[in-house]
């Protein structure tokens, strides 16, 4: 990848508190943009020398999402855990939903979290792009990842403050204008394998 100047990172996610799943792990690739994605794909299809070699596992589904980093409340890199925690929830949009408004609400939420002294996590909105069926039962997957275990624990401890803030500011009502429903959260572990970006 580096030899060819390709910008790509790969992580592995494994179920922790995710109920019954049809998979043992999820491989997650990230590119800076669509241009870099197809450049890396093309290099794999044309230049990779080990195609057909024995793999340690078989992936039965390959899909692509539009990945929008909706919020990032970062901490110093040296405080990151090697294996982090990530919560996933699939959501359905309302008929009158507005993507711009959803992003605006995310910006409001980021500011509110800063006011409440919360940090150490990021929120991504993943919208289906390639490889999905027309009857895909969700419009977006929300991922919340925590940079270390202490920040995950702090998020639980600070939830009453967040709940009160949401009530006072009508956050749930605003969110409900655009999001019809979301599934219960599923917890995965997240570990970076490599990054050439």
Model features per residue range: what roles?
Residues 1-50, 55-169, 173-197:
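Short S/T/G/P-rich N-terminal loop/turn motif that feeds into the first structured element of a domain
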């Amino acid at each position: 990848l580096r030899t060819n100047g390709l910008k790509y990172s790969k992580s592995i996610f494994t179920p922790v508190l995710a109920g019954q799943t049809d998979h043992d792990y999820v491989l997650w690739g990230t590119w800076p943009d669509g241009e870099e994605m197809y450049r890396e794909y093309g290099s794999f299809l044309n230049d990779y020398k080990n195609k057909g070699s024995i793999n340690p596992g078989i992936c039965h589904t390959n899909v692509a999402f539009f990945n929008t980093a909706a919020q990032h409340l970062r901490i110093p890199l040296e405080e990151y855990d090697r294996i982090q925690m990530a919560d996933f929830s699939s959501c359905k949009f309302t008929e009158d939903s507005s993507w711009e408004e959803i992003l605006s609400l995310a910006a409001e939420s980021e500011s509110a979290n800063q006011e409440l002294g919360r940090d150490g996590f990021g929120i991504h909105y993943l919208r289906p792009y390639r490889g999905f069926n027309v009857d895909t039962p969700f419009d977006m997957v929300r991922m919340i990842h925590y940079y270390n275990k202490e920040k995950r624990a702090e998020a639980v401890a600070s939830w009453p403050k967040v709940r009160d803030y949401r009530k006072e500011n009508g956050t749930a009502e605003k969110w409900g204008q655009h999001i019809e429903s979301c599934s219960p959260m599923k917890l995965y572990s997240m570990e970076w394998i490599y990054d050439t970006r």
